[in-house]
Amino acid sequence: MNIGRIVTAMVTPFNEQDQVNLEATCQLVNELIANGSDALVVGGTTGESPTLTTDEKMALFHTVVEAAGGRVPVIAGTGSNNTRASIELSKKVEDLGVDGIMLVTPYYNKPSQEGLFQHFKAISESTSLPIMLYNIPGRSGVNLDAETTLRLAELRNIVSIKEASGNLDQIAEIIEHSPADFSVYSGDDSLTLPLLSIGGTGVVSVASHIIGNEMQEMVQLFLSGQVERAAAIHRKLLPLMKTLFMTPNPTAVKAALELKGLPVGHVRLPLVPLTAEEQRQLELAINPQFNMFVS
């Protein structure tokens, strides 16, 4: 499964009635494709998946596949902390035309490494779709160790991982010892360039909603050997990347998209909108050099 270098973990637009806004979703898909996204992850944790019903997820997946129209791969977020529910949803999306699925590490129940292995193995055996694992210990409460990831990488349809542990030693071990066709993506925007430097593939990004073309330029410069120019862009983008995570994701990036004129709406409870001070910080971080204008 070739999904490129800059993969955007899409937010889920909501309207004023707190319903999924499918019209705005189509608009967002077109905006992201036009601005540097090589692939889209839909209904993941950036898409507030724990707050979505199964029917909402299915409608979202269908809408994004239709809107993308084969221009970029679409990855459906079907993971949860319920193995059986993840299996059921992974089976359901096979008929929608998605190109793969993403499975987050189970949150709250804190399984052992063997429990994590068996969870992902059971889901992989239930579907023919390519699978991207998603390790995010800061939110799930458990780290998917390198050894466990490498065991999973041997399974036929587990083909990549979004690594958001922030542990470059662990990530380097995975890159060094995984099969040649196993792809490792950064799950942290700010670690995109460092991960590329140790042999990673790219990033599953939140910031690409706002600075996708700039991130794409950074990656392409690095790949062409222009490391100093890539590093300069990295340093330039870093303050905005950090600001987008000053509150629980995706609160700030949704506010930033609204500033760009994209009607993605609010976050669902239990998340809450930015405070006035946080909004001010966000507006200061949206630099005119990115051709972003705050009205």
Curated annotation (Swiss-Prot):
Concerning its family, UniProt says: Belongs to the DapA family.
Q: What organism does this protein naturally occur in?
A: Halalkalibacterium halodurans (strain ATCC BAA-125 / DSM 18197 / FERM 7344 / JCM 9153 / C-125)
Q: What class of enzyme is it?
A: lyase
Gene this chain is encoded by: dapA1
Query: Which keywords, in A-to-Z order, does the entry hold?
Result: Amino-acid biosynthesis, Cytoplasm, Diaminopimelate biosynthesis, Lyase, Lysine biosynthesis, Schiff base
Report the locations given in the UniProt record.
Cytoplasm
PANTHER family given for it? 4-HYDROXY-2-OXOGLUTARATE ALDOLASE, MITOCHONDRIAL, DIHYDRODIPICOLINATE SYNTHASE
UniProt key word Lyase: yes
Mind telling me which SMART domains this protein's record contains?
A: DHDPS
The EC number(s) this enzyme carries: 4.3.3.7
Q: Which InterPro entries match?
A: Aldolase_TIM, DapA, DapA-like, Schiff_base-form_aldolases_AS, Schiff_base-form_aldolases_CS
User: What does the record give as its pathway?
Assistant: Amino-acid biosynthesis; L-lysine biosynthesis via DAP pathway; (S)-tetrahydrodipicolinate from L-aspartate: step 3/4
What is this protein called in UniProt?
Answer: 4-hydroxy-tetrahydrodipicolinate synthase 1
**Protein task:** Catalyzes the condensation of (S)-aspartate-beta-semialdehyde [(S)-ASA] and pyruvate to 4-hydroxy-tetrahydrodipicolinate (HTPA).
- Extract the Gene3D superfamilies matched here: Aldolase class I (3.20.20.70)
Give the principal location in a single coarse category. cytoplasm
